Amino acid sequence: MGRSYYNSKYSDYNNLMYSKVYSGLTLGIDGMMISVETDTSQGLPGLNLVGYLASSVKEAGERVRAALKNTGVSLPSRRITVNLSPADTRKDGALFDVAIAVGIILSLEYFDISDTLYEEIQRTLFLGELGLDGTVLPIRGTLPIVDCAAKNGIRRVILPAECAAEASYIKDVEICPVSHMAQVLSIFIEGKWPESYVKSDIEEESDEVLVDMADIRGQEMMKTGVIIAVAGFHNILLTGAAGAGKTMIAKCIPGIMPPLSYEESMELTKIYSVAGLLGHEAGYIRTRPFRSLSQNISQVTLLGGGMNSRPGEVTLATGGVLFLDEFPEFPRNVIESLRQPMEDKTVTVSRLKASYTYPARFMLVSARNNCPCGFFPDRKKCHCNAREIKKYQEKISHPIMDRIDIRLEINPVSYNDLFSAEEGMSSSAARDKIMEARERQESRFGNEEFSFNSEIPQGKIEEYIKLGSGLEELLQETYEASNMSARGYFRVLRLARTIADIGGRDDITLEDVEQALYYRNENEPTNWL
């Protein structure tokens, strides 16, 4: 007779056996420990699962029963109750299957194991979906679950082999990948744990760029504006005729962005893990995302949600670029839904009785033509009238425009610039300038929760942005003359702070403010009609 795992106060009841093992789930991009309690007793035979379960979890009983049978373990005619706690948290998905199977085996005392092994099991997390043949299948959200488990005293994780790479970067946890339930049973039969996964070195960020700035002829003011935007993580709108180079300059941006910090890389990898977008051999994500959206995107795909409350594109772009080409052609409700994540840097997804808050710290890069046909101001090709152009530009509402710090008008490249032998600024040189400005911001905001000038809260503007009397007068005149909003005023200040950082200046100068106002282009979009 094997070891009994129920509480000693019930030791007189030979028909009551109890076990407890641990699994986990994701809440947003955070993990949560789940206790899997199993009670086996005399009574009407059956396998009952309780604990606020989605249908995918309720179906686990049949999957586990078949997987155990096909691995050589037949369940006796007993009443088996499995409780997943805490009971007030909804459990969804098939990631609890392995833990449920282990709990049943322990509760039935199917194998005789030592006290030492049982204690080790209590410090082990079990994850994985089971196929009917006993195959252990991969799951989503491994990284945040393992991270949470490590912080709660777990020292070993049994998980699908495909999920081992992403989990291996969590310190002080032994990762034991398995591909079949038979490997899990060998723990009880032989007292031997599966072989540990050997973590590979974290790959360095790739130096490969989509487009090098040096390949773009002319457009020096546009390049400067893009450098400022990236340095301070400011939203940017590129406006110009078709073929002027808007999409090309947007594709330069990933190559000039600063590298991800460890914390940013961890957060981004958790996001992609929860979304199920990490490759089986993938470790940490080391490059900033560049998410280019299709014009037929739905609001759910953009913000997140759906049946599994998956992260949307605004979350997948965290730390990187969210690119919307032909911005006015997107559905109006999609454009307007960007208001809240652009302002708050988070997005809340609600489903049933649960809501999840995901990060949405992206840099919006948008592009549009001057008019519906795309040829304005070339009147030989463009036949749009002023009313049509104005209507087209106003598809982007004032509240959205107010959240865009830099609005660049891009003119077609002249013939002389196109064939000039003079080489423009390269992406490498641009990145060096951005890194210098980034280092100044890191030094300035070292103890803050925000990292970039564009993220300075309104309540801390005076602390980090100081203006002389002359500058305040200029801003007051502009504020009153252009009917600038309060939001726009503070965004100009943040932009001026970034321009000063690019120039290596501690104090904001008159030229910095004037340049910020130029790039803000408050009278846009109809000032040239």
Regions found by a protein language model. Name each.
Residues 2-237, 241-247, 285, 350, ...:
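Peripheral, non-AAA+ core regions of ATP-driven protein-machinery
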Residues 132, 322-323, 329-330, 415:
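Residues immediately C-terminal
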Residues 227, 289, 300-322:
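Conserved alpha-helical scaffold flanking the Walker A/P-loop in AAA+ ATPase domains
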Residues 238-277:
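Walker A/P-loop
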Residues 283-301:
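Inter-Walker segment of RecA-like/P-loop motor cores
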Residues 319, 325-326, 337:
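Walker B catalytic acidic pair
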